[in-house]
Amino acid sequence: MIQMQSQLEVADNSGAKRVQCIKVLGGSKRRTAGVGDVIVVSIKEAQPRGKVKKGDVHRAVIVRTAKDVRRADGSVIRFDSNAAVLVNKNEEPIGTRIFGPVVRELRGRGYMKIISLAPEVL
């Protein structure tokens, strides 16, 4: 679960390394976000000459969480860290590559571009 002030790794080559959640989208009282949800993030650490720079505000889709993701068949999947992919207003990825595995639940949310760029879908 991701909430305001949560720090996440960036799993793409947009130039950002670390981001902080500043808003969970999807309702005025919504406090937490899980895999496949869109959040608003501030870039806290970035690579030089990247597409984004420190201090920028962007939207991001959560692709990995340390909190369990429960599947319909009863299985559970979790990761060591929280990670997100930066997206634009149309929810298309800013980067051209995705690093690390992503969860299958993104397919049901309509993020086929992220699924196709990912090296592994769990």
UniProtKB/Swiss-Prot annotation:
Listed PANTHER family: 50S/60S RIBOSOMAL PROTEIN L14/L23, LARGE RIBOSOMAL SUBUNIT PROTEIN UL14M
GO MF annotations, alphabetized: large ribosomal subunit rRNA binding; structural constituent of ribosome
GO biological process: translation
UniProt keyword list: Ribonucleoprotein, Ribosomal protein, RNA-binding, rRNA-binding
Function: Binds to 23S rRNA. Forms part of two intersubunit bridges in the 70S ribosome.
Gene3D superfamilies: Ribosomal protein L14
InterPro entries tied to this protein: Ribosomal_uL14, Ribosomal_uL14_bac-type, Ribosomal_uL14_CS, Ribosomal_uL14_sf
Name this protein carries in UniProt: Large ribosomal subunit protein uL14
Record-linked NCBIfam families: rplN_bact
SUPFAM superfamilies noted in UniProt: Ribosomal protein L14
GO cellular component, one term: cytosolic large ribosomal subunit
Pfam families in the record: Ribosomal_L14
Assembly and interaction partners: Part of the 50S ribosomal subunit. Forms a cluster with proteins L3 and L19. In the 70S ribosome, L14 and L19 interact and together make contacts with the 16S rRNA in bridges B5 and B8.
SMART domains documented for this protein: Ribosomal_L14 (SM01374)
Family of this protein: Belongs to the universal ribosomal protein uL14 family.
